[in-house]
């Protein structure tokens, strides 16, 4: 069984004509997967493309 770690991902995403800040807690195996999962969540929930999401930091909790 693979151990999942908690990561805190901070950044901003394009909401209309403005940028909105966000902080998300993501369960993932590593930092790269946490970043990809964040892009995926914003794409599915907010309909934004990866280029409209700017991740500023990823830290293990």
Curated annotation (Swiss-Prot):
Keywords annotated in UniProt: Ribonucleoprotein, Ribosomal protein, RNA-binding, rRNA-binding
Domain of life from the UniProt record: Archaea
InterPro entries recorded: Ribosomal_eL20, Ribosomal_eL20_dom
Signal peptide: none
GO molecular function: large ribosomal subunit rRNA binding; structural constituent of ribosome
GO BP field: translation
Keyword rRNA-binding: yes
Pfam families in UniProt: Ribosomal_L18A
GO terms for cellular component: ribonucleoprotein complex; ribosome
HAMAP family noted in UniProt: Ribosomal_eL20
Family assignment from sequence similarity: Belongs to the eukaryotic ribosomal protein eL20 family.
Subunit structure: Part of the 50S ribosomal subunit. Binds 23S rRNA.
Protein name: Large ribosomal subunit protein eL20
Organism listed in the record: Methanosarcina acetivorans (strain ATCC 35395 / DSM 2834 / JCM 12185 / C2A)
Species classification: Archaea, Methanobacteriati, Methanobacteriota, Stenosarchaea group, Methanomicrobia
